Amino acid sequence: MFSEEGQKELERMLSRYPIKRNALLPLLHLAQKKNGGWLSEESIKYVAEICEISETHVEGVISFYTMYKLRKPGKYHLQICTCVPCCLVGGEELLEHTESKLGIHAGSTGDDGMFSIEEMECIGACSFAPAIIVNEDYHEKVNPESMDQLIADLSNNP
């Protein structure tokens, strides 16, 4: 399932966990990263085999944590925080603006596969609210105008 480099990373990771099932969360992160930001049925089965646990157990863990995705995200995955600190300074309005601008709702990906939007409860950037994450990059004090510029910049980088 993994490339040669990914397999080496997997082996390094497993060497830190004498009990294989304890590596479940890091393995899910690795599998998701190596699979373009989401967990396929194949990757879930592979992780279950490595950890020597059932696929049902792995699926239960995936459903508990919001950071694991079962659908392929857009090339640019916009995670918009709507926790109280962000909402107090425009987080909900920013989410609505972004949905309107891209013509998609939170939890979905545009037909062209370029953007996906996810509403987040908290991304740990309360001091810089409203905040968003694009893929793995944080953007702080985002407003509708700066979101429009960000979307334009990303759109010009297909």
Predicted feature descriptions by range:
Residues 1-158:
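Signature of N-terminal electron-transfer/Fe-S-associated modules in redox systems
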